[in-house]
Each structure stands twice: as structure tokens, then as C-alpha cells.
Swiss-Prot record:
Residues 164-243 form the Expansin-like CBD domain. It comes from Oryza sativa subsp. japonica (Rice). This is Expansin-A19. CDD domains: DPBB_EXPA_N. The keyword Secreted applies. Glycans are attached at N116, N216. One of its GO terms (biological process) is plant-type cell wall loosening. It is found in: Secreted, Cell wall; Membrane. PROSITE patterns: EXPANSIN_CBD, EXPANSIN_EG45. Keywords: Cell wall, Cell wall biogenesis/degradation, Glycoprotein, Membrane, Secreted, Signal. Its main location: secreted. May cause loosening and extension of plant cell walls by disrupting non-covalent bonding between cellulose microfibrils and matrix glucans. No enzymatic activity has been found. May be required for rapid internodal elongation in deepwater rice during submergence.
Amino acid sequence: MGNIFLQLLAVVALCIAPARSDWLPGTATFYGGADGSGTMGGACGYGNLYDQGYGINNAALSTPLFNDGASCGQCYLIICDYSKAPDWCKLGKAITVTGTNYCPPNYDLPYGGWCNATRPHFDMSQPAWENIGIYNAGIIPILYQQVKCWRYGGVRFTINGFNYFELVLVTNMAGSGSIASMSVKGSCTGWIQMTRNWGANWQCLAGLAGQALSFNVTSTGGQTIVFDDAVPAGWSFGQTFSTYHQFDY
């Protein structure tokens, strides 16, 4: 049976591109109910995952995977490690999920539980998890790797905050799915470096109300895109603006 699993792993690796060559071991549980509705919101700040382009195939990431929010939006290909749990794995099945939430350690449990500070663990939406695992297992050993994200449409920017505080939520990002650095430019300013506030929310203290806004975004994959005038003058806090540009890596 071990040979069958190795053959399956090779087939999955050949069919997924582009992808990193290394499969990494981890574990996975599920949450959010049979319809996944309990996974909406989360520590990345995406809110309604359907509206933001992520859907039901999502996961809360343990501390080493979440990386203080720097991994928000990244995509992971996951298979159940059949060689370790043949009774609980669905042979030949794989699922790609987006990191949308944080799974914190539970220090009421020994060593902080499954989402302890050192374990690579995915607390997946139940519908996503059931693609690869048998429900009664509860937790399964997995193999995973980060893969390219695919999204419909362009990158979106939601402008939150107040007065001299701009908090920009970046969503629907393809390619590596996550942001390494970001700057903003008003129609009356030069480029202003932004910093991560929390999750996929980036901030600046510039007082840009009333100005058209451009963004310079570099993905964790190393691609930089300048979104010229992504937000028109006269915008209001709480508005979302879609673009025609998208990341490849």
C-alpha cells in the first residue's frame, strides 16, 4: 500500500504547477460547521470570504505558518498522508486552501494543543477538510506545499480608517497571494511607505482624504505592480475599489 501512496504523491506533484518541489509534513483539523459559515471573518481581516474572492476552501494557520499575518492570502496544496493514516485518508484526493485566519495555541491543553507555537497545522473549513479526510477522524496527518493562487478579476483595495489614519485592506490577490511591502501615493504627495497593521490590512498616517490614491505593491513572490489611480478622488472610508491588474507570482 505504501507504493500506491508514493505513486499517488508523484502524480499529484506532476499535475500541480507551478509548485514548490518539497512536500512538508503537518496536521489538519476542521472547524466552521458543515457549510463552512463559521470560517467567515478571521485574523486576516477579509470578512465575508465569498465576497472577497476566497470562498469555502480556506484554513486557519498555526503560529509558524501564520507568521504574524504575513502569510494571509497564501495558497496551500494539501493531501492526507495515506502512509500514516490509511483508515482516515481519502486516497487520491487533494485540496488547495487559502490562509484566511489564525489558529492560536490553546494552553489549556498539553503543549498548546494542535495549534501550538511550533506545529505546522491547518484548521481547515469542514467542507475543504472533508475532501481529503474521513469525518470521524477529527485530525489527520497531511503533506502540504505552498502553490500559486488563482483569483477571478483583479486585486481589490478597501479603504478604512478615519481622518489622518488610512487602513487599506488588500484582497483577491493571486500569485503568491500575500504582500511583502506596500506604498501609497496621493495625487498631492510622493510615495509613502505603509506598514502592516494586522492581517492583510496596511496602514499609513498621511491624511490622504480627497486625493486619488495609487499603490505600489510587492508580493512575497517578488513581483511589483503599481496600481495607478486605483482609488479615485472623492472616495469615502469603507469603500472597496477593484482593479484590472493581478499578480502572477
